[in-house]
Structure formats: structure tokens, C-alpha cells
From Swiss-Prot:
Annotated stretches, region: Disordered: 178-205
Main location as per UniProt: Golgi
Position of sequence motif Switch 1: 34-48
Modification type N-acetylserine: residues: S2
Protein name, entry field: Ras-related protein Rab-1A
Annotated Pfam families: Ras (PF00071)
GO BP annotation list: autophagosome assembly; autophagy; cell migration; COPII-coated vesicle cargo loading; defense response to bacterium; endocytosis; endoplasmic reticulum to Golgi vesicle-mediated transport; Golgi organization
Catalytic activity: GTP + H2O = GDP + phosphate + H(+)
Top EC class of this enzyme: hydrolase
């Protein structure tokens, strides 16, 4: 299994953040396992998955942490910002409030993450065209003003999901430069079993 293969050139720790219900877990499920479920339930605390990718002839192991969006878990998840190489901020294109809260999530990054961490803005659920309230141009201009890459995704039909994680990996690799090695990121590799605990309530697309 490629995800268990220790032979890799880089290990990047990525973090998914954003309001509860925007589809963070579904994006991760689509990217890591290429599956989707309508009945995915709210993440409690933190879960993570690993996927190994090839980029520019290099093998990159992505350790992707999925955080709970609920306020009561904010203190738990804040510690996961430290050591992250890239942070993906997710909002729901059908939920204006989730987009408005992106600024608050970016403040969390400034507060807890390393100064040079890579960021990516993702507008999820773009398949729900009739319910869309956050315009692509509005989000793109916002991201451009901050110098952050932006993509609209759909975990449901797999639109741009692969591209989002590959974009993030490429940005981190570019920042680290040719001299970086897998060992440089190894200190953030937390050895725990992935045993997500879920509770019912609120699906995602």
C-alpha cells in the first residue's frame, strides 16, 4: 500500500479548517479514498488521513489533518496549526456566513501557525449551482488580495479536489526549495492511530 511506504522525498503536514458543515471531511475522504457519502457526520476533535503523491518526479507523503469546525473544539485544534506546512481554508459556496468567517479563520492561522505557512482558499459544494450565493469573482478577488491561491471544489463530483491538494503540495515544495528533505518535516509526524469519533448531525457535500 502506497500510504504505508516509508520511501518518500518529502513529508508535508496539511490542515483543513473552516466552519462546521462546509465539507472538510468530504474533501479529505474524496482525496484520500476517492469516496463520497451524503451522510458524513460532524468531526469530533481531529482526524487525519495519509496519501502519497508524485510531483515533479518526487514522492511526497501528505499527512492531512481534518479539524472540527465547532467553536467548542477550537482549543483542541489550535495546537495542530503548529508544525503545519500548509493550511486549506474551506467555505461553502451556498453559505455566505461560512465565507464571511474565512477572515476569522485566517486570523487563527496568523495566531497559531508558523509565519511562512502556505495557505489555500477553497470554496466547496460548487456542484450546487442553483443554491450558490458566494460569487467566484468575489472570492477570487479576496484571495488575490491576500496572495492566496483559490479554487472552487465539489467533493460530491470530485471537481478540483485533486487539484486543490496538488496545488498546496506544489506551493509548499516551491517554498521549501530543492535543498529540503523528508527528514526536515519528520518532526511533525505524530504517530497515532486514526480512530475518528463521529457524532450525528449535519451532512456535507
Amino acid at each position: 500500500m502506497s500510504s504505508m511506504n516509508p520511501e518518500y522525498d518529502y513529508l508535508f503536514k496539511l490542515l483543513l479548517i473552516g466552519d462546521s458543515g462546509v465539507g472538510k471531511s468530504c474533501l479529505l475522504l474524496r482525496f484520500a479514498d476517492d469516496t463520497y457519502t451524503e451522510s458524513y457526520i460532524s468531526t469530533i476533535g481531529v482526524d487525519f488521513k495519509i496519501r502519497t503523491i508524485e510531483l515533479d518526479g518526487k514522492t511526497i507523503k501528505l499527512q492531512i489533518w481534518d479539524t472540527a469546525g465547532q467553536e467548542r473544539f477550537r482549543t483542541i485544534t489550535s495546537s495542530y496549526y503548529r508544525g503545519a506546512h500548509g493550511i486549506i481554508v474551506v467555505y461553502d459556496v451556498t453559505d455566505q456566513e461560512s465565507f464571511n468567517n474565512v477572515k476569522q479563520w485566517l486570523q487563527e492561522i496568523d495566531r497559531y501557525a508558523s509565519e511562512n505557512v502556505n495557505k489555500l482558499l477553497v470554496g466547496n459544494k460548487c456542484d450546487l449551482t442553483t443554491k450558490k450565493v458566494v460569487d467566484y469573482t468575489t472570492a477570487k478577488e479576496f484571495a488575490d488580495s491576500l496572495g492566496i491561491p483559490f479554487l472552487e471544489t465539489s467533493a460530491k463530483n470530485a471537481t478540483n479536489v485533486e487539484q486543490s491538494f496538488m496545488t498546496m503540495a506544489a506551493e509548499i515544495k516551491k517554498r521549501m526549495g530543492p535543498g529540503a528533505t523528508a527528514g526536515g518535516a519528520e518532526k511533525s509526524n505524530v504517530k497515532i492511530q486514526s480512530t475518528p469519533v463521529k457524532q450525528s448531525g449535519g451532512g456535507c457535500c
